[in-house]
């Protein structure tokens, strides 16, 4: 198991689903702090919106639960909360702390950050990567960062390819969300960057 103590980057999940945080936090012990995109569903467009607008509209306007597939879900414009009861004030406060921690980490200049995202099979969110990079550079100009973007997209159209050396885009050969695949991919990306 790799540990954050032996690695020079802060590793941070930016969604799109719970498995990314589960791999980084539980299976690899790479992230000891909770951040806002851990254990929620989020669109990449939403991540970009939240970064650009200080997390405006992160929570559903009216936190009314929907009971579906054995889960109590809260639907926002760019988010779905499956594991958190947003009707509980302490849960909302915990997310607000995560947001402050996340923004504070991005504003510091000390540690580089590796953002990790997994994207679903139905459309190619990777085409939004240039906008994400632009927003990060605009809002946090001193931040040194990389992005590992793992996509389950299986469409026939041309796949996104980045020319930015700090952006790693990997199209996975399956629609299945498999944590073991993430474990391997994250391990490969950080393997050569130990402190």
Language-model segment annotations:
Residues 1-195:
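Extracellular glycan-modifying ectodomains
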């Amino acid at each position: 198991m790799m540990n954050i103590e032996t690695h020079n980057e802060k590793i941070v999940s930016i969604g799109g689903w719970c498995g990314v945080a589960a791999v980084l936090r539980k299976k690899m012990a790479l992230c000891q702090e909770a951040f806002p995109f851990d254990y929620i569903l989020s669109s990449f467009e939403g991540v970009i919106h939240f970064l650009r607008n200080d997390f405006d509209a992160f929570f559903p306007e009216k936190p009314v639960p929907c009971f579906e597939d054995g889960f109590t879900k809260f639907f926002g414009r760019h988010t779905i909360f499956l594991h958190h009861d947003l009707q509980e004030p302490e849960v909302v406060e915990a997310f607000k702390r995560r947001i402050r921690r996340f923004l504070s980490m991005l504003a510091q200049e000390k540690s580089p950050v590796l953002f990790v995202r997994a994207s679903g099979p139905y459309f190619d969110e990777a085409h939004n990567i240039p906008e994400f990079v632009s927003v990060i550079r605009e809002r946090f100009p001193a931040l040194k960062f990389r992005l590992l973007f793992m996509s389950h997209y299986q469409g026939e159209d041309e796949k996104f390819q980045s020319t930015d050396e700090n952006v790693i885009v990997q199209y996975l050969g399956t629609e299945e969300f498999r944590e073991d695949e993430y474990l391997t991919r994250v391990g490969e990306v950080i393997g050569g960057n130990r402190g």
